Amino acid sequence: MNDDLAIAQATKLKPIDEIAEFAGIERKYLKPYGNYIAKVSHRIYEELAQREDGNLILVTAITPTSAGEGKTTTSIGLSMALNRLGKKSFVTLREPSIGPVMGIKGGAAGGGYSQVLPMEDINLHFTGDIHAVSLAHNLLSAAIDAHLKFDNELEIDSTQIYWPRAMDMNDRALRKIVVGLGGKANGYPREDKFIITAASEIMAILCLAKDLEDLKERVGNIVIAKNKKKEYVLAKDLKVHGAIAALLKDAIDPNLVQTIEGTPAFIHGGPFANIAHGTNSIIATKIALKLSDYVVTEAGFGADLGGEKFLNFVSQVAGFKPSVVVLVASLRALKLHGGAKKDSITEENLEALEKGFVNLQVHYENLRKFGVPVLTALNVFPTDTDSEKKLFEKLCEKHGIPFGESRVWAKGGKGGEALAREVIKLAETHTSEYHPLYLMDTPIEEKLDILTREIYRAKGYELSPTAKAKLRSFKKNGFGNAPVIVAKTQYSISDNPKLLGAPKDYIFNIRDLNLSAGAGFVVAVSGDIMLMPGLGKEFGAQRIDIDKSGKISGLF
């Protein structure tokens, strides 16, 4: 079989006008970027608002291997399969961050015969949204240092500045820096750092805002520092929130592209799921729901990260009511959770598979707590043996877990038809009784207790002295009931990446709490979470090339 890029480049794309017409998007709302990409004005929602929503299908996964479980590929393939079965569908996904594309992860536009296209553009720059977020973020950084240099009327404490700088590249040398060197003309020296743009609060805001006015208000509410009286200083105190919103005036519009089979796709926004809420923009999904029978959307990493955040936080903010949750699993990941060595998970190992199945069980049970029908999708790999697949089926039947096989990587939409039929059956015969595990105004301590016990299966949690002090400050300043986004490892249900399978009855440690007042949540940090990745000894950029005709190679 050809590699992903060869398959993508061999596909004859439809003009974006045709994709928009099929989706029901009028030409007046389109801003084309070449022949195969277009921005869709977010204002189209005003015209569509009175229509009924289609069915929202959330795709999440078990605790993944470092290679991922294939959520994006499954999401794309499922949307194509639904279209093949006569259901008008849309897929809504996050935009890839260039840093990981150039690093170890590679591209993030699906794979095999289940891709969104044009994949080279999607993976490299796209419509410039991430660059716009970087500029907006760094305008605020520059404004802070300008204010410090010229009189500092807000009395900002230079040792209590929370706002870093941002760049969409993996660069470990920028994790800790000193700015303002070179004399008084360059400002005052202080410690600073860079984070990757996907980790910026502005990226989270872009994906949560309902319109430009809401976006501007949220940006204005970003807490950038404390002053010398220990009071919060906000972005609007520097009077740059209007300019930041202006920089994002096009970025707020969803990007329309197509799947390999011509299914409409929105690719918009890219917050990470282990440090933010981990799903594409609310605007894109809300528009798609008005245009389709079925919208397939993905939440990053496992069900304990992106899945939990979508169901507890994003759905409450947006007013979503998911119809079905699809839980993607692979035999190789289950074998890893059952004790198989990382370099041998492609080999048959029935004992490890049976032992590791408990990871799937826990995620399935957790998702059912939200009142939404859950379907497991077995992402089939060529190395899966018949004996392993039979054992998986037997275990699912034993524990009452409905499942369907996904072969979309190898067969495109046709390989997802069995899964799509099960999704349709669940959506049309089961009423979703969706409910979050906590309400928005629940105190932070109660939210943490619910999450650590119900999702992470801990017996409780413990706050570090730093986290306790910050919680007191949040309460004092009116943020004691803020929604909670837990930043933790993606490789375990717990806070320890080495605890595979289904750990339980441990203490979940929270070392820090960070306020994202503009986005509207508090981030509870557990363990070592990296906000600026680094390139490895060997990395993706070393494989990427371009010839004299402009044809790109090496992307995957």
From Swiss-Prot:
ATP-binding listed as a keyword: yes
Keyword ATP-binding appears in the UniProt entry: yes
Species the sequence originates in: Kosmotoga olearia (strain ATCC BAA-1733 / DSM 21960 / TBF 19.5.1)
Enzyme Commission number(s): 6.3.4.3
Coiled-coil positions: none
Reactions catalysed: (6S)-5,6,7,8-tetrahydrofolate + formate + ATP = (6R)-10-formyltetrahydrofolate + ADP + phosphate
Sites where the protein binds ATP: 65-72
GO MF term set: ATP binding; formate-tetrahydrofolate ligase activity
InterPro entries: Formate_THF_ligase, Formate_THF_ligase_CS, P-loop_NTPase
Family recorded in the similarity comment: Belongs to the formate--tetrahydrofolate ligase family.
The protein, known as: Formate--tetrahydrofolate ligase
Any one of the GO BP annotations: tetrahydrofolate interconversion
Pathway involvement of the protein, from the record: One-carbon metabolism; tetrahydrofolate interconversion
Keywords: ATP-binding, Ligase, Nucleotide-binding, One-carbon metabolism
